[in-house]
Curated annotation (Swiss-Prot):
It comes from Azoarcus sp. (strain BH72). SUPFAM superfamilies: Urease metallochaperone UreE, C-terminal domain (SSF69737), Urease metallochaperone UreE, N-terminal domain (SSF69287). Involved in urease metallocenter assembly. Binds nickel. Probably functions as a nickel donor during metallocenter assembly. GO terms for cellular component: cytoplasm. Keywords: Chaperone, Cytoplasm, Nickel, Nickel insertion. It holds the Pfam family UreE_C. This is Urease accessory protein UreE. One of its GO terms (molecular function) is nickel cation binding.
Length: 159
């Protein structure tokens, strides 16, 4: 089995592809098959989210491109930006992964959320496409007091 433990940042073209849906692209430990049929084991840092187009470096030197596989999604559109913001708020309140586009939101297909969105007045269309949701506010890490970020802890009583 081919082992992949790191990302590739160079200019070499990929020689193979690893197609995964979003659920699998959030796994840092994974056994899968490349487009060539070769079996691969991913051992990436915990918390890694793979994105379509990223390149990985196999232990044998091969460069493998990540492909975001098409999956069942719902595209949400609204009559105006305020209604779309309201739909986004309610999805975020439920901690739903959301992909943002110009005038639309996309979520993984879910009949309960579909009903909620329709109830909010949104137009909801099923589609099959790659899913690349927002990574979240802390996806690139956040800083803590004492780490040089300038953050301060304010103690009660002015201490």
């Amino acid at each position: 089995m081919l082992l992949i433990e790191s990302f590739y940042e160079g200019v070499r073209a990929a020689t193979d592809q690893l197609e995964l849906d979003f659920g699998y692209r959030t796994k840092s430990r994974l056994r899968a098959k490349l487009a060539s049929g070769d079996e691969v084991g991913l051992f990436l840092p915990r918390g890694t989210i793979l994105r379509g187009g990223q390149k990985l470096q196999a232990r044998d030197g091969r460069v493998v491109e990540v492909v975001a596989a098409p999956e069942d999604l719902l595209e949400v559109r609204c009559a105006d930006p305020l209604e779309l913001a309201r739909a986004a708020y309610h999805l975020g309140n439920r901690h739903v992964a959301v992909e943002l586009g110009d005038g639309w939101l996309r979520i993984q297909a879910d009949h309960v959320l579909e009903g909620m969105l329709i109830g909010l007045g949104a137009e909801v269309l099923p589609l099959r496409a790659p899913f690349e949701p927002e990574a979240g506010a802390y996806a690139h890490g956040h800083q803590h007091p004492g780490d040089g970020s300038g953050a301060r802890i304010h103690m009660m009583g002015g201490q």
